[in-house]
UniProtKB/Swiss-Prot annotation:
An annotated GO cellular component: cell envelope Sec protein transport complex
GO molecular function: ATP binding; metal ion binding; protein-exporting ATPase activity
Gene3D superfamilies per the UniProt record, alphabetical: Helical scaffold and wing domains of SecA, P-loop containing nucleotide triphosphate hydrolases, SecA, preprotein cross-linking domain
Main location: membrane
Alphabetically ordered keywords of this record: ATP-binding, Cell inner membrane, Cell membrane, Cytoplasm, Membrane, Metal-binding, Nucleotide-binding, Protein transport, Translocase, Translocation, Transport, Zinc
Natural source organism: Geotalea uraniireducens (strain Rf4)
Gene that encodes it: secA
Catalytic activity: ATP + H2O + cellular proteinSide 1 = ADP + phosphate + cellular proteinSide 2
Protein name per Swiss-Prot or TrEMBL: Protein translocase subunit SecA
Annotated segments matching region Disordered: 857-894
Length: 894
């Protein structure tokens, strides 16, 4: 109560933040008359003036009012669009490194030009991240006109560009692109053999559009670059044939006299847990699979790979559905993005799951790939010095943004009052009853001409609904992953009179639905059909379309605007809000309502028992609908339960992934140092000395006479690595101790190294060391990633041994990393001392062979996430980031 009183007096945190920014808005408005009086050249010269003032020490914050005023004026002159006051506030929030929540239709794309322009004045680059190539290209061409007018360069990163084109785009003042392309470019750069081949530069400032989709929805999906393995694909077909012979069972609970109270019992051959998306063999199932595959023991270490593929095949059949999770197009399995409904060509599930689904669908199986490089979006975006984001729906996840990413959410007020009523949910007992009611409402609204946007959560459901509408003779458009190419065109006309649009998911569609239709889109479509038409004809047709759309707009407004009809609740309230947000933009009228059934996935998995009890209590008959506060509350509780469950998973995974991320930073930093050629020979000699020291320490035992040391073992190890025989006279051996043995060996090894340098020459030797170091690091890192994957798969079982899996994972991942570093060092030293080169071309051939790898770009199935920290170079006296507790110079920085 006291907190509520304080809030009433001083306002909420969001209100206080907005109050703090309004005086700056007034400053910008005060400058408008002065700035608008400038000529185009004078306005453009302001950019040069700002850059000079920044170079002299003025801060971006002090330049902000003038810079925003200049950018606003450029928008008016170039696009005929003036930034509203609330858009200026949105721009300030983004500049501060926060998330701006702006409702659909409030002009997020235009808002981004303000902080982009201001931060580009530093000359260090600004990255504007969008969710697909279409939006990246559109925004770079559309909003890029403002920046180009003001003298800044604009680039765009989309699929299909070569390295030179990418480098040019990254070197621009402002670069637009997709999150996937930016992430993969980072991984590709860190696999290259020359710094000159890198395309990206420093990570200065990033504005992420649909930030909730990227930092929350895709939090557990790593980007993976992989190379093919040589394994046969026959095993996938063999295992796939036995899966239909297995019977799905269920988990039963029976009373037991144990401390836990109840004991689980399983029926059938396997059980499915839809919450965790897992399928598990029962004891009977294991015996049946062993018999079918003619395997003695599925859990024998030699058969663990077979067990893994059986589990993935189970998941493929029991949990992944055609036209929901993926589609089959032209003999290829294509993933459907569950958050946006888009197809993701070129992306594959990892760890054998994609191959299992290919076997299930009877299409050609592509070889399984081995991970060469991987990163999550969180780990990529946390490298930016300043990160900001925009979305229409972030407030429901404000706590997670703050706790995990230290990003505050500021809700920006709308330019005009929202007039959209959101009607209570209508619930039916069965899906069939629900669809009948949906069709009836669509028919009524269509009869009076009101446009309707129907939201579904899968391609399968959208096609069922489309078929029902066809039977009723109701014309409509379907917008799902299968119609990706027509997406913008369909969305643009979704607000025309009588238009019915079915959409799988509206997240990130990027095109506003204008009541009455979009005249520009209609004119462009006309131009595609009339390519020979003159500019004059085009302008005349555009004017006609504008008049037609304006008249239709007034009619649609009288009919109540765009009606949103949701056919199922998503697991996240935010996705539901994104669908609702397509209506009521910029003060337009609109409405929304969700139709649900007890057979919907959300209610069936997470909340049906409570809802069913309420419906029974209220004596709801079959075919009868209910709209009741208790039901709506129960549904919201189910959604909160799912959101909390997913939040806990992401938070938990962050702690796991932090270990891997620190190790990656160490490896990539080492690669960069090698590529830069800084002290490469000194680094190699340090490796040599450490290898000798380890050998001496391993065989020469203090307080044990030298004659009793394991000279045979020492000699074999020295010969294996350095290629010479240990020959120490008896009188010298008597005087040896571990310290002077090390000195003796180091002296001999240095002599051999000097002879190698004399044989090859300084330049060739340095080049050889560089190539072998990179080869060894890349090979060992690739194997380490595989080891980490295997460790991650089995670490959960440690809980049964009363051990904390998280701590066990950190400890073992650290040990694996240190073992990898040791193997890398020994491999480099051994190769250099044994290598024989006839010509310099041999070294270049080694380098070229390493470069020639067929790479595959995947979205991983393994969940990962990460807490952001500021990335910086590790000092030699700072603690090592691998977690050993040692100084960097004494650990991974050796």
């Amino acid at each position: 109560m006291f907190g509520a009183l304080i809030k009433k007096i001083v306002g909420s945190k969001n209100e206080r933040e907005l109050r703090r920014l309004w005086p700056i808005v007034e400053q910008i408005n005060h400058l408008e008359a002065e700035i608008s009086s400038l000529s185009d050249d004078q306005l453009r010269n302001k950019t040069t003036e700002f850059k000079e003032r920044y170079a002299r020490g003025e801060t971006l914050d002090s330049l902000l009012p003038e810079a925003f005023a200049v950018c606003r004026e450029a928008g008016k002159r170039v696009l005929g669009m003036r930034h509203f006051d609330v858009q200026l506030i949105g721009g300030m929030v983004l500049h501060q490194g926060k998330i701006a929540e702006m409702k659909t239709g409030e002009g997020k794309t235009l808002v981004a030009t303000l902080p982009s322009y201001l931060n580009a004045l530093t000359g260090r680059g600004v990255h504007v991240i969008t969710v697909n190539d279409y939006l990246a290209r559109r925004d770079s061409e559309w909003m890029g006109r403002i920046h180009s007018f003001l003298g800044l360069s604009v680039g765009v990163i989309i699929h299909g560009l070569d390295d030179d084109e990418r480098r040019e785009a990254y070197n621009a003042d402002i670069t637009y692109g997709t999150n996937n392309e930016f992430g993969f470019d980072y991984l590709r750069d860190n696999m290259k053999f020359s710094l000159d081949d890198y395309v990206q530069r420093d990570f200065h400032y990033s504005i992420v559009d649909e930030v909730d989709s990227i930092l929350i929805d895709e939090a557990r999906t790593p980007l993976i670059i992989s190379g093919p393995t040589e394994d046969s694909t026959d095993k996938y077909y063999i295992i796939d044939r036995i899966i239909p012979l297995l019977k799905k069972g269920e988990v039963l609970e029976e009373e037991a006299n144990t401390l836990s109270g109840k004991r689980k019992r399983y029926t059938g051959d396997f059980t499915v847990d839809e919450k965790s998306k897992s399928a598990t063999l029962t004891e009977e199932g294991v015996l049946k699979v062993e018999k079918l595959l003619k395997v003695d023991n599925l859990y024998d270490p030699r058969n663990m790979e077979t067990l893994h593929h059986v589990n993935q095949a189970l998941r493929a059949h029991a949990l992944f559905k055609l036209d929901v999770d993926y589609v089959v197009k032209e003999g290829e399995v294509l993933i459907v993005d569950e958050f946006t409904g888009r197809l993701m060509p070129g992306r594959r599930w990892s760890d054998g799951l994609h191959q299992a689904i290919e076997a299930k669908e009877g299409v050609k199986i592509e070889n399984e790939n081995q991970t060469l490089a991987t990163i999550t979006f969180q780990n990529y975006f946390r490298m930016y010095e300043k990160l900001s984001g925009m979305t229409g729906t972030a407030d429901t996840e404000a706590e997670e943004f703050h706790k995990i990413y230290k990003l505050d959410v500021v809700v920006i007020p709308t330019n005009r009052v929202l007039l959209r009523p959101d009607f209570p949910d209508v619930i039916y007992k069965t899906e069939g009853e629900k669809f009948n009611a949906v069709i009836e409402e669509i028919r009524e609204l269509h009869a009076k001409g009101q446009p309707v946007l129907v939201g579904t959560i899968s391609i399968e459901k959208s096609e069922v609904l489309s078929e029902l509408l066809k039977r009723q003779g109701i014309p409509h458009n379907v917008l799902n992953a299968k119609q990706h190419e027509r997406e913008a065109e369909i969305v643009a006309q979704g607000g025309r009179k009588g238009m019915i649009t079915i959409a799988t998911n509206m997240a990130g569609r990027g095109t506003d639905i204008l009541l009455g239709g979009n005249a520009d889109a209609m004119a462009k479509q006309w131009r595609r059909g009339n390519p020979e038409a003159s500019d004059g004809e085009y302008e005349r047709v555009l004017a006609q379309f504008k008049e037609q759309c304006a008249n239709e707009h007034d009619e649609v407004v009288k009919l109540g605007g765009l009606h949103i009809l949701g056919t199922e609740r998503h697991e996240s309230r935010r996705i539901d809000n994104q669908l609702r947000g397509r209506s009521g933009r910029q003060g337009d009228p609109g409405s929304s309502r969700f139709y649900l059934s007890l057979q919907d996935d959300l209610l069936r998995i997470f909340g049906s028992e409570r809802v069913a009890k309420i419906m029974d209590m209220l004596k709801i008959e079959e075919g009868e609908a209910i709209t009741h506060g208790l039901i709506t509350k129960a549904i919201e509780n189910a959604q909160r339960k799912v959101e909390a469950h997913n939040f806990e998973i992401r938070k938990h995974l962050i702690e796991y992934d932090d270990v891997m991320n620190k190790q990656r930073e160490v490896i990539y930093a080492q690669r960069r140092e090698i590529l830069a050629g800084e002290g490469i020979r000194e680094s190699f000699l340090d490796m040599v000395d450490e290898t000798v020291a380890d050998l001496a320490a391993g065989y020469a035992i203090d307080k044990v006479p030298a004659q009793e040391w394991d000279w045979q073992g020492m000699g074999d190890s020295i010969y294996k690595i350095f290629g010479f025989q240990v020959d120490i006279p008896a009188e010298t051996m008597e005087r040896l101790n571990p310290f002077n043995l090390r000195e003796l060996l180091q002296e001999k090894v240095r002599e051999l190294y000097t002879a190698k340098v004399a044989e090859f020459g300084d330049e060739l030797m340095d080049h050889l060391i560089k190539v072998i170091m990179l080869q060894s690091i890349d090979t060992q890192w690739k194997d380490h990633l595989l080891s980490i994957d295997h460790l991650k798969e089995g670490i959960g079982l440690r809980g049964y041994g009363q051990k904390d899996p998280k701590q066990e994972y950190k400890k073992e991942a650290y040990q694996l990393f240190m073992d990898m570093m040791l193997r890398t060092r020994e491999e480099v030293v051994e190769k250099i001392f044994w290598v024989q080169i006839a010509r310099e071309e041999d070294v270049e051939k080694m380098e070229e062979q390493q470069k020639r790898q067929r790479l595959v770009f995947n979205l991983g199935d393994e969940p990962e996430a990460q807490q952001p920290v500021t990335s910086k170079k590790v000092g030699r006296n700072e603690p090592c980031p691998c977690g050993s507790g040692k100084k960097y110079k004494q650990c991974c920085g050796k």
